[in-house]
Amino acid sequence: MNLSYLVACGLMITLLSVRMGAKPLSQAQQKSFRSLLGEELAEFLESEEKERRLDAVRSRLRLLRDLRMDTRARGVWARLLNDQPVPRRHKTGIKKGGSSRSGCFGHKMDRIGTISGMGC
């Protein structure tokens, strides 16, 4: 039973690994093919060649765009991982007195810190 599964999997892998590809026509074959098909189909074949070229240009543009996006992502990571301290802006205003309202370093304590008394 297991042997049949193993053989079936091996056969599937073998079939998947075989590539089905078309070989390009030589110049002589293309000329004879165009003479048989006529001008209309010859133009169609030429348009396919143009389409292939256009696809190649599109793929190059896609690669350049991906490269640009990759450098942007690197820049974001570099900014995030930068070790330089960022200057902090402190709010300037009237501070209300009272030790119950302020916790560590003059900042307002959160609810858990105020209730439990575990704050600074």
UniProtKB/Swiss-Prot annotation:
One molecular function GO term is:
hormone activity
Q: Which residues form the signal peptide?
A: 1-22
Keyword Secreted in record = yes
Which keywords belong to this entry? Answer: Cleavage on pair of basic residues, Disulfide bond, Hormone, Secreted, Signal, Vasoactive
| Protein name in UniProt | C-type natriuretic peptide 4
Its Gene Ontology cellular component terms are: extracellular region
Q: What does this protein do?
A: Exhibits natriuretic and vasodepressant activity. Has cGMP-stimulating activity. May help to regulate body fluid homeostasis in a variety of aquatic environments.
Note whether Signal occurs among the keywords: yes
Q: Which family does it belong to?
A: Belongs to the natriuretic peptide family.
* SMART domains assigned: NAT_PEP
Intrachain S-S bonds: C104-C120
Highest taxon of source: Eukaryota
Q: Which residues form the propeptide?
A: 23-96
